[in-house]
Swiss-Prot record:
The keyword Nucleotide-binding applies. Interacts with PEX6; forming the PEX1-PEX6 AAA ATPase complex, which is composed of a heterohexamer formed by a trimer of PEX1-PEX6 dimers. Belongs to the AAA ATPase family. It is a peripheral membrane protein. One of its GO terms (molecular function) is ATP hydrolysis activity. This is Peroxisomal ATPase PEX1. One of its GO terms (biological process) is protein import into peroxisome matrix. GO terms for cellular component: cytosol; peroxisomal membrane. It catalyses: ATP + H2O = ADP + phosphate + H(+). It is found in: Membrane.
Amino acid sequence: MNSIDAVVRYSPLRNNLCNLPSAITTMLFSADFNIQQIIVELSWVPHQRAAQRRIAYCGWAGGITKTSSSNPVIEIDRSLASAIDLQENVNVTVNVHIDAVKAITVELEPVTSNDWEIVETHAQVLETYLLNQTRCVYPNQVLVVYPTPQTTARLLVKKIEPEVSTFAQLFNDTEVQIAPKVQKRPSISSVRSDSSGHRIRRVRSSTSTATGRRSVTNNGEVLPSMLRRSITLPNNTYAHVNDSKSGGYKVYCNLNELIPALQNAHFVSVSVLVGPGTPDRTGLTSSKIKQLNDSIDQAAQTQTNAAGSSHPPESSYTETGKVIAELVHDSKSPKGNVGLSELLACSLGIENTVGNLISLEQARKPLIKNPLDTLLTQLMQLLSPLLDSCTFTNCVKLPKIGTLLPNGGLLQFKRIKSGWTTPLGKDNVSLEIGEEILRPESFIPSYDLLPDRKTHVRTQSDQYPTAQENLIESLSKIASGGSLLFGTSGSGKSLVISQVAQIVTNKGHFVKLLNCDKIMSESYNNLRGIFEDIFSEVSWKAPSLLILEDLDSLIPAEQEHSDSSQSRQLSEYFISKLSALSINRDITILASSKSKESLNSLIFTTHLIEHDFQLRAPDKEARKQILQSYLDTLNVFCSEGELLNNIAVETEGYLPKDLKVLCDRAYHDLISRDILADSDSELDIEESSTPILNGSVGDIANKQSEIENGISGLELTNNSSSTIAVDKHGATIQKDNFDSALSGYIPQSLRGVKLQKSDVRWDDIGGLRDAKSILLETLEWPTKYAPIFSSCPLRLRSGILLYGYPGCGKTLLASAVAAQCGLNFISIKGPEILNKYIGASEQSVRELFERAQAAKPCILFFDEFDSIAPKRGHDSTGVTDRVVNQMLTQMDGAEGLDGVYVLAATSRPDLIDSALLRPGRLDKSVICDMPDFDDRLDILQSVTRNMNVSKSVNLSSVAGECSGFSGADLQALAYNAYLKAVHEKLTKDESMAMAGEMDDNDDKKRMVECFQFSGNTEKKSLIELKPSDRATVIKKLEHLYQGNGNHAEGETKSKLATTAANSVIITSKDFEDSLSETKQSISQSEKRKLEAIYQQFISGRDGNMPDGTASNEIGARSTLM
């Protein structure tokens, strides 16, 4: 292909490829060549005097350049151009090669040891993306690789197999070998035994490497320096170092890692490099802050522009004030880190921090103060030539004179108060050296002004997350990939995170904690700016741990009918930035949220979050430890040894925050009772002092002053609860205090959860002895005998099916067992969870079990279970089929039902899907059978317990006449008998009122006549009042007639009379009348049908799965497909 001439332009391609002008690309596209096959040859003359042209080879990136004026343009990366010494705007000749020799083996060698460190760190990245960056190699080529967007490394091509004279093409099977190149570092003993001449020669050679830096003094002296990451003491990483505030200024580091010049130094000059997150108090004046920020930006821009050059420029970072410190060898110091003594860290303004970059520079030679006489003699000798050549006046400025006057000075003549002055010769002139003028104030604080260690050391929090040691240990391990800590509000996430941050900091890692709740209202652009600063800081101080607390408030899950654009934008931004940071630097992410579902799902699509930990509600032993921890903080002791154990049992489902509030309420109750007791004792003293008034006036005055002093002391005590706490040192808390605290308190997990409370007591249910016994074994025993069941290796049953005849007490039994066992109760009806839309019913079931899990220990009761979970395959809409599938998933144990018991009630167990009746789901089936004679008698006694039944009533005979009655029928029988007695009572009261037998307070009889009138002229039939209504009206008139005389006494007598008059007594006749009107709710035919179904359910099930064939029986349901 014909060659063309083009002009070189730099472009940030970040590879060893180039973009070609359209004159070439048009022919390549028309010829249908593969981009990977094209090799571009560039030849140019380096400068006008050069006699030989230079040649380089590269691949084609597939891009097309824009032609400027009439000259074609070729674009190339700046780093690649610097490696092949190709300047911008140079004319080059471009040739395109199609057929090239394929390289089998390529041997490379890093140009410097720093290049080898970069290659070794990012070996996996280079192995993956090397072919995307390079298409060909040629002998003695300086190959530039780009492991990260910010770094480059240069490799020299040493050998190519097969040997070629021009170039060879790389392909997938090419083996690339990179030889290591490690910098040799001499030992400490050999360095410190060298002479000063050897030392200077090594320093000058080391300053040309990238590991060292150079600092030039005003006198032109070159001082070597290095950059290191700092860890301020005290820190567990340097726990073996005995450091104190009086220990002086010291730097602890491994001298083997330093450059030779610093290895031999006993003192170094320490300064802080200003970077992202550097404290503002690091020895800087306020006027320099803007200049430092500008210098950082300029340094970053210069480094970007000069990346990949053959001689990289020196760093232009800005340093703060310098402090001379002693260099101490510490072989246990982490690699790349140095420890700063507490005094040195406070002087630099970075106390109690980790990760700041500091510069270690060889200290200058100290100025030796000469004797005054010698100094004056030398100064006079140097000033003699100036005295001959010029005349000095008062306050003339003197020039800089070596080490005598390094900053120059002012000449001042002494004044003579009186007398005549005569000129003197030079030999008679006397000199004196005064004080320094404009001495700069040191930024190092005075020793006495330095804060104590206790203000800087991160002491362990008083509220340590009890019973979470394993979780904290897992979170504290810095590993690849992020972690998510989720739990409900009040579960202790913030406390665990603060403890993890403290542990990680003590390991020498930088920790950045951000509470996302505080910035959730910011706009997207502002949030990007905030996180750009945070990412820069954690990258600058790496290795780092970035903690994002309450991340779900910033990037919540996308809702169906809400605008989630900002959440999606932030999620994509986090994924791109944090993924790049995690790969390039040692940065780990720890986020917290209320649940995994509350976060945007995009976060979990990548490996940004690889580990998740859930904070569950503490178990009984953990609750006991938490209660003990809070009581120890309050300095309160328990009155009984088993008190905390009993309280832990009663607080099932309480979160750590709830337990803290409970302890505070109990402590407040204790203090309140003490205050009331003290108040009562003071009042008793005051009352006992009343007889003193009969004495003399002096005695009365003295006693009055004593009472006033006692009252004032009482008021001082009541004004401060802390004073009472001191007086009650080691106070003992009682069970009554906890009972008062528990009374009326709703745990945070139960707030907003709809719980049903039933007034039915366990004694109110008659009969059902077997069913009640099985329920107590399942629900009450695991809590009552927890130590025995905890050692049981078997899985406890958590599901019970109550089936039986209608009206036999299934629902009543389920509502009463919750109160009997102290469990929460959630009742569900079918229409509450059934929804025709796909996914809505499943979501309702999931939310239902989540509610039960939050309210555990809890009973989840499904009434009429056959309507919610019928056999699958017979529903044309598929709603109940999906509900059954979801319930199988929730009850199977995969989701976990710890503390949640499922009760289901039905009268048709044959209609329930058989998969729900297998072990592990509804483990036990309990029948609620028709009551026999003993059960009927027990039911009647339970129902009539709160009724006034005449002693003449024989409940046994009534129970004998109720054969075939269910429990609901017997209850209806008793209620009907009570209504009969009420009607008789009302009729009797009406007749007494009409006959005038009810007397007033004066025992005068009155006649009450009831009549109706209407103002309407139209004739209408009057409505006659019922006897009950007439009696009510008469009673109201009676109360109005009584008036106000003797109100209190009359009211008391009226109440007693009313109670006696309103008592309703049920007689045998009432039961006989009720029995004649009450019929059985279950017919004999229905009873026989249900009995056959229950018998088949108990003993006739074969366990076979349905084969999917529709039933041909009459009345069977089928699905139209």
